[in-house]
Amino acid sequence: MTARRTRWTRRTDRSLPIRSAAAAVAFAAGATACSAPTGGGGDGGTEAAESVVIGVASEPDTLSPLLGYGKDGNSKIFDGLLARDTDLELKPALAAALPKVTDDGRTITFTLREGVNFSDGEPLTAGDVYTYRTVLDEKTNNTARSELDAVRERSARADGTVVFTLKYPYAPFAARTVLPIVPEHVAGKQDPNTGDFNTEPVGTGPYVLTGWSKGEKLGFRANPHYWGDKPAVKSFTMAVTADDNVRATRLRSGDLDGAVLPPNLAATFEKDDGRRTYRARSYDFRAVTLPSAGQVTGDRAIRRALDAAVDRQAMVDKILDGAGRPAYGPLPVDDPWYERGIERPRDLAAAGRILDEAGWKPGSGGIRARDGQRASFTLYYPSGDKVRQDHALAYASDAKKAGIEVKVEGATWEVIEPRMKTDAVLADLGSVGDPDFGLYTLLHSTLAGDGFNNMAHYANPAVDEALDAGRRSQDPKVRAAAYREIQKALVADPGYTFLTHIDHLYVLADRWDGLTTQLEGRTNTASPAGPGGTSRTGGRKK
């Protein structure tokens, strides 16, 4: 890795503003691609440390970028035209240089890097950028298609030049070109939805897949054809362990070299001389989806009352042990696009007034009701996710004090997904980079129910208009005004209850010296799984 190395802070130190949107992926990428194992570590010394086993919570549905895998530049199997360095700045990857922008932002021209081969030994060509055409094809099952809405056409030239023509100027388009490029000579001969490429990928990245035991592990080794600096780690395994407690037990037993853990479990390793705990800030936030179709969750007064009743700071202090920040919206408080002044402390009195004025009156057991309808709904969280479980229980406790009953249930995603239209979910969301990347898919009414986009089925014409303005304008002042309006609208008309922005805690065997950041930067991708992928088809995150 040629980017500047920035040490991840020990949890006991002052944390750096490192932003990563998928904890396990960033952790694995940093440990494998950028760390140098020392000879004084565990049994076996340097030789043993050249391979590593990382515990992750879940696995991807696919390893194909055509269906959303690694779409935010986080993959270790693939590369995009551009990549991000540790400071979030764009840098050339498969492109030889940053693009040339002409025609008032409507024409974007790239020149490919020479001498790049795929892991099967075949050379990269401009024709391989067909990736974009396939993603945009409505027959391709990729719910991230809206992220490339600005693209009118893509053309490839024999001299290695790739030209994108846009429908309208799209200020953050260059950042979209971190999308991984796949080989047309392999993937182009298959059905993108069902072909073998989904489980047998061929890419240009530093690693190649060696095996995938569904539900158990994914194995990787260094790509001998890789065009960049060779990774220090020759092979690694992503061990899929959904339950946080089991993952911690496996780490303690030595079965894992590292893992992403919630604060309460990471704290149990702080005095372990053989391991280090690292902390990194992120864009990840926890929020409760409040579906518009729900009889209770769709009521605006209920939504506003819940927003007023929740004690965000207590969640940061008690659930995250201080490793996070209150979330007053989808953007973290230290983001340059964040709208200062929308902060709001817990106010149970205000919650009561809102419900009284809307006709929700106290009833049996202190739970409010209106026209025979109790203010009660179910809140799902994925079983085994300790952080989300704790958030859900705290949320239910806060809601009850306002007279709203929240019934918390843990379940598998097979159970949760069919219920998302009408039942609340403790969601794990977040987006690094331009605000368009996360806000559009989170809030635009045209994406309601599209996979894991707009899970609340939120619909606000003024917000839609502002989202479109922010996406289509290149004027920084116009864009800033649009995103200010959106954040204020979410206070007056919430579709989600935003709870916390979390810091990621990583526990790693001490023999890994020089751990560095490796940005993963996904937008609304799924719970982290695999080296830079999304856990669910289409770049969706729950």
UniProtKB/Swiss-Prot annotation:
Record keywords: Cell membrane, Lipoprotein, Membrane, Palmitate, Signal, Transport
Domain of life: Bacteria
Signal sequence extent: 1-33
Lipid-modified residues, S-diacylglycerol cysteine kind: 34
MF-aspect GO terms: peptide transmembrane transporter activity
Protein purpose: Required for transport of an unidentified substrate.
Protein name: Protein XP55
Gene expressing this chain: xp55
